[in-house]
């Protein structure tokens, strides 16, 4: 069990698709007696922001190819627009998740899988960030088993999912997805 709020532990997990990162997060949380958030985080963010959950599901770890997040944030923080209402929907989704991650980390010990959580919590003294990797062969075998695919389709799904995750992470954070220096 994790101790009092003064001893709070927040572990963020980035992961390659098929590496078992989500499963590792769940087992780690169970062992520590804390919650693991992944898709649940989307629901929490949706409820707190008032945006519907279906909208969040469609934006789940998918980047946009429009202007950079930092530019958007500068524009909104400097007041060049009327309000949050004018913001593109994908940015609303990202900001709601970002906010939910920060609130969770302030409130409780937990494990958070994906969602640029390490970036959201980079200034949080209780947060530790890890990235889970596995060999391509191990990942293909795992994805084949889970999704009942052949080698080729499993490898294709891995490549597409990793590319999507990297694009999302690199787009919304100032770091590079999967690069050791981006994590603890």
Regions found by a protein language model. Give the residues of each.
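Short beta-strand-centered segment that lines the nucleotide-binding/catalytic pocket of NTP-utilizing
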Residues: 35-47
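Pre-Walker A (Motif I) flank of P-loop NTPase domains
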Residues: 7-16, 108
């Amino acid at each position: 069990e994790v101790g009092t709020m003064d001893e709070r532990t927040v572990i963020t997990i980035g992961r390659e698709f098929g590496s078992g990162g989500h499963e590792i997060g769940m087992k780690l949380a169970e062992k520590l007696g804390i919650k693991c958030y992944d898709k649940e985080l989307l629901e929490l963010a949706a409820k707190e922001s008032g945006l519907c959950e279906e909208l969040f599901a469609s934006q789940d770890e998918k980047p946009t190819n429009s202007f950079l997040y930092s530019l958007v944030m500068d524009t909104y923080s400097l007041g060049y627009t009327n309000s949050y209402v004018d913001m593109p929907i994908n940015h609303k989704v990202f900001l709601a998740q970002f906010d939910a991650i920060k609130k969770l980390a302030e409130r409780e010990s937990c494990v958070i899988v994906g969602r640029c959580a390490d970036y959201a919590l980079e200034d949080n003294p209780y947060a530790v960030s890890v990235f889970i990797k596995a060999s391509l062969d191990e990942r293909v075998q795992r994805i084949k088993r889970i999704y009942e695919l052949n080698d080729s389709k499993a490898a294709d799904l891995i490549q597409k999912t990793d590319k999507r995750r990297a694009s999302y992470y690199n787009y919304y954070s100032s770091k590079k997805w999967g690069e050791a220096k981006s994590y603890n």
